[in-house]
């Protein structure tokens, strides 16, 4: 591992690291915020997954999460949104390829060689964080848009791994919206049954009651993608039918930007702290 940057921040440290990923077959970067140590108890971790076109730095520089994370004693880990490099398959569109990994394991050429973000987030990155930093094994997950989709599927596919999950403007039903249909058809092929294991709504309908974890979703009602791409009401209906403990908050006037995230990230951190710090 190689440290690329380090900055003092709210008595903690904001760092950026590069490592060689055996899962993704390329070098990867991630950012991490280490809060000031409190006692001898290792702090819990909140993983943040960003959206289309982003990398590990968008949340770090725009969300303003460090102050509250420092106060609460929560480590923040921000991975990249896809594998990257000259040898990694790409596309001219902003919503496919590098910067648009959709947090799944691709099965189709040319994507399958590198695009295994699900395995990277489930296994390799948490193991790396555990081995290199003083953290506990208690973790939660959150994200925005494509990253909200990622956070939800990570939680739904791994019962018991996360204490809680939250999302800002997530893509909840990718099987049925243009972003998801484009990505899934390329990454996973035309068999739509294979798509269902990466769709939060399908996963929630298939979930067991004992696996439900506290879930918070914020959605701005002035989001230009709300009607065509996001459709959080579809997941809310699944949660209702499954009695899943989910709160969906529609925030008047807010759009899809990091101004929206910055406005409510404190709520999300305090939401996760209730369960991470038990």
Swiss-Prot record:
InterPro entries: AB_hydrolase_fold, Esterase-like, S-formylglutathione_hydrol. One of its GO terms (cellular component) is cytosol. It catalyses: S-formylglutathione + H2O = formate + glutathione + H(+). Keywords: Hydrolase, Serine esterase. Gene3D superfamilies: alpha/beta hydrolase. The keyword Hydrolase applies. Its EC number is 3.1.2.12. GO terms for biological process: formaldehyde catabolic process. It holds the Pfam family Esterase. One of its GO terms (molecular function) is S-formylglutathione hydrolase activity. The active site is at residues 145, 223, 256. Serine hydrolase involved in the detoxification of formaldehyde. Hydrolyzes S-formylglutathione to glutathione and formate. Belongs to the esterase D family. This is S-formylglutathione hydrolase YeiG. The gene is yeiG.
């Amino acid at each position: 591992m190689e440290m690329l940057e380090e900055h003092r921040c709210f008595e903690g440290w904001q760092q950026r690291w590069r490592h060689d990923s055996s899962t993704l077959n390329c070098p990867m970067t991630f950012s991490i915020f280490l809060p000031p140590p409190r006692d001898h108890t290792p702090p819990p971790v909140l993983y943040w997954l960003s959206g289309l076109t982003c990398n590990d730095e968008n949340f770090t520089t725009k969300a303003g999460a460090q102050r509250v994370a420092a106060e609460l004693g929560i480590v923040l880990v921000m991975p990249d949104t896809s594998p990257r490099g000259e040898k990694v398959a790409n596309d001219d569109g902003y919503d496919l390829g590098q910067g648009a990994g959709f947090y799944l394991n691709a099965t189709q050429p040319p994507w399958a060689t590198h695009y295994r973000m699900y395995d990277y987030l489930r296994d390799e990155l948490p193991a790396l964080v555990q081995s290199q930093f003083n953290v506990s094994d208690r973790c939660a997950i959150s994200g925005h848009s494509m990253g909200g989709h990622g956070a939800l599927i990570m939680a739904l596919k791994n019962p018991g791994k996360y204490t809680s999950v939250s999302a800002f403007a997530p893509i909840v039903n990718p099987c049925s919206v243009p972003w998801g249909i484009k990505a899934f058809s390329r990454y996973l092929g035309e068999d739509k049954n294979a798509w269902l294991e990466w769709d939060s709504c399908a996963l929630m309908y298939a979930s067991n009651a004992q696996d439900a974890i506290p879930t918070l979703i914020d959605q701005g009602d002035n989001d230009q993608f709300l009607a065509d791409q996001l459709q959080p009401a579809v997941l809310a209906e699944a949660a209702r039918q499954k009695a899943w403990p989910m709160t969906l908050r529609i925030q008047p006037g807010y759009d899809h930007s990091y101004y929206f995230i910055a406005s409510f990230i404190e709520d999300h951190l305090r939401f996760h702290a209730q369960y991470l710090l038990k």
